[in-house]
Regions:
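Long, ordered, helix-rich scaffold segments
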Residues: 1-227
């Protein structure tokens, strides 16, 4: 219904019929009537994703409706899975939920993979509400750390776009306050240096030869001691 009754702004033509905002409101109200806790995990994901599609197609809801959606979803954020946290962080940030900055930065700091970290950083990039200087500092410090992450050909540009959007969302006062941090250049290290830091503190066991490892692997790897 959202796709049929509303066309997103990026693909809208002058000849297209006007957005059916009444249908958009009905979709949002129907979602608000659902009991999140009674839904299965896959249904919860579908529910939040439907909110996203509806808001892209019909535009940001009124403050009253936005507050209702925030009240419905914020109680379940953070969730138990990355997939749900990603969608909730993205949706609540779009609605300018007052707690999403703190919760999102906490998830960003705890995320164990660069992929998860990138999604949280991307979701928070346009958020303007709920920030403190400490949270902003943690957020922009992440961009200094991620300079040593690795990805495909467009990886660096993708991160640059996220950071540019985040800087653009700052007020003039915030830009002035964070100026030293925003001007700081990341220390880019070689893959060998990054690996050496990751291995720091580990005990040297043995300088293995390829022939030794080949023999061990051919015997099977069951009942190994990882201690």
């Amino acid at each position: 219904l959202a796709k049929a009754a509303g066309i997103d702004p990026f693909h809208r033509k002058k000849s297209d019929p006007p957005i059916n905002r009444e249908m958009g409101n009905k979709i949002l109200q129907s979602l608000l009537e659902l009991d999140f806790e009674k839904l299965s995990p896959s249904e919860q994901l579908s529910m939040v994703r439907t909110y996203q599609v509806a808001m892209v197609r019909f535009g940001k809801p009124s403050k009253q409706t936005a507050d209702q959606i925030i009240a419905q979803l914020d109680a379940h954020f953070p969730a138990k899975t990355f997939e749900m946290n990603w969608l909730l962080c993205e949706t609540l940030a779009f609605l300018e939920a007052p707690t999403v900055a703190k919760k999102g930065i906490s998830l960003l700091n705890k995320a164990t993979t660069q992929e998860e970290q990138m999604e949280y950083a991307r979701s928070l990039r346009n958020l303007k509400s709920g920030w403190t200087n400490e949270l902003r500092t943690q957020y922009f410090n992440w961009f200094l750390k991620e300079a040593n992450y690795r990805g495909g050909a467009s990886f660096t540009k993708f991160i640059e776009f996220i950071r540019n959007d985040a800087v653009a969302s700052l007020s003039n006062a915030e830009k002035k306050e964070l100026a030293p941090l925003l001007a700081q250049k990341a220390e880019v290290k070689s893959p060998a240096e990054v690996m050496a830091e990751a291995m720091a503190g580990r005990t040297f066991v043995k300088n293995w030869e390829l022939e030794e490892l080949s023999k061990i692997s051919s015997r099977g790897l069951k009942e190994r001691d990882f201690a």
